[in-house]
Amino acid sequence: MYELKENPYPMQPRERLEFLGEECLSDVELLAILLRTGTKKYSSLNLALEILQHFETLDNLRKASINELREISGIGLAKSIEIRAMIEFGKRIQTTNRKRYGQVLSSREYGLSLAFEMQNFEQEHLVATYLDGQNRIIEKKTIFIGAVNQATASPREILYHAIKNLSVGLLVAHNHPSGNLKPSQADKIFTTKIKKSCEDVGINFIDHIIVGAGNYFSFREEEIRK
């Protein structure tokens, strides 16, 4: 639970950040700086505390809509929009840091990148990534949105785009909104089918990755471990 502890320092959050560095500030202090001002009833620190206590975790705050933010006393439309913009900007910075654009270097790196990109998806998405001979990304395409058992019916559309792009390599990935990374029987059957289909047309099937809850499962890594 968040609480506003008595500040042993004579400095306000902005001054503390300037002289001590941002890593020394609490979540409440950092949010107070982003809010800039408080209200007649609350200081920026108290308002920041009210927000964090309301949503309980940073992850809940990250998912909060403009209307949900406006439910808090002192948070109007303008501040709600500013908070949403701040969250989205942070997301884009994090995406840049997590991912080397243009090339797949390993199942781990790409799996973690996809786990971040797909973490807010409430439905299952099947995504195909098409690569050239240097593992550079030619195209990343969402093939299907919905239940996996429907998405796994046929690899035909995946291979259609692979051939169209003159792809040398292929990765496929889908998310489990539940966060459970254990592959289902349908996942295993699909992996076998798409791998065989790639072999038939001379495309290197690199991996099938399952993502959820910020992590990933790699069929390729699992096979290597056996």
Curated annotation (Swiss-Prot):
TM segments? none
What does the UniProt keyword field contain? Answer: Hydrolase, Metal-binding, Metalloprotease, Protease, Zinc
Q: Which residues bind Zn(2+)?
A: H174, H176, D187
The UniProt entry, under SUPFAM superfamilies, shows: RuvA domain 2-like
InterPro entries, alphabetically?
A: MPN, RadC_JAB, RuvA_2-like, UPF0758, UPF0758_CS, UPF0758_N
Q: Name one GO biological process term.
A: proteolysis
Matches recorded under Pfam families: RadC (PF04002), UPF0758_N (PF20582)
Residue ranges annotated for the MPN domain, each copy included: 103-225
Matching PROSITE patterns: MPN, UPF0758
- The sequence motif named JAMM motif is recorded at 174-187
Q: Which GO terms describe its molecular function?
A: metal ion binding; metallopeptidase activity
Query: Which family is this sequence assigned to?
Result: Belongs to the UPF0758 family.
What name does this protein carry? Answer: UPF0758 protein LL1007
